[in-house]
């Protein structure tokens, strides 16, 4: 069950004709109550009490064990945006400040059925005494991300046909919080509780320079350079990996190894740093609005996700890693046409991505495609206006295949998980809706998504997948105050 709430308040004041002051306050809340169930095979390798060190180890296989998770996720975002725009004789200058605080909380409890009977590879056996118990995992998370951003942007009209733009932004980001895992219990393992505290501060800077030339009334060409950054989300600062250092019970010589045992570790994730050059044109041809651009983006420390599962967060493991350096070269095309009551739109994005500096741990080699990035994205849109207030809107969206990296459990429980490659297939979906404009400040939209019941996966690995919903219906209302 998911509950979303969103509140926004906008205010604009013009003390002079050439000065505009604007402010926005917003708050977003999301509460999710999740109950999931999974069936997994549990493997335990243990050297029981009473045996000489290393002289005897038994592998216990518990097949088809049912586990249930009850969890509550809370996300709260609130922020403030201040902006002032001043128009002068040959242009305009904008000053701004952004503030945002995001709080993520999680409280989850996972318990398997009681482990009792197992197979050691030769025969079926039964646990004894206090080792007859379920696997229990508890997690509590409270993480905060707070950011302060300051920026200035200037547009200078060098001539009637040439505009020059410059901009600068700085952001200070603070992370604070903790993640408590435990007390966790399972057969042959002493109860364990681990806590990770996060207290980090990042400072990032961005800038841009651009030029736009109007070669005729309807046509313009532009060139821009941008140096940017992307800061990590608070929940990306920790990994969930297999725990190979479980505490042994009193009397046991070797620590046990359990395939479903996990722990959280700090990953020291860095911010992404980007350098982008873009050249584009926009004009009208034969009554059609057309735009095209080519761009090249080099990213240092691009953040990528390596995950093990998609259906049950209780048994899912993940790692966030910075890729040394990546490159994207792309072409973007857009067009719009109007024929009476009909409006058509098309867009096409072609991307060629590659890794410039490898990350061996993530199995990313020089020349590989960047994970989770499709090479092609295309959209087709149609809109028919029945009246000035009522319109039929349809959209077709296509994504091509993309590569991923995923975590696969190692056969040797004394070693960390393996990383393998996987390719996710492409798909296209069609949405259809009716838009009603009540007035200049509000509208209502009702419709259906994926009207042809296209089968594809929201998330997937080479072993499992989370199917996307088939046809779904929605009601959307927008109001401006």
Across the structure, where does each feature detected by a protein language model lie?
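Solvent-exposed loop segments that connect transmembrane elements
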Residues: 1, 35-70, 109-138, 176-200, ...
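Face-selective signature of the C-terminal outer-membrane beta-barrel domain
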Residues: 4-182, 214, 291, 338, ...
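Residues on the lipid-exposed face of transmembrane beta-strands in outer-membrane beta-barrel proteins
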Residues: 9-13, 80-86, 150-156, 209-213, ...
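Membrane-embedded beta-barrel scaffold of Gram-negative outer-membrane proteins
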Residues: 10-12, 18-38, 214, 220-222, ...
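Structural signature of Gram-negative outer-membrane beta-barrels, strongest in the C-terminal barrel
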Residues: 90-94, 98-102, 138-298, 349, ...
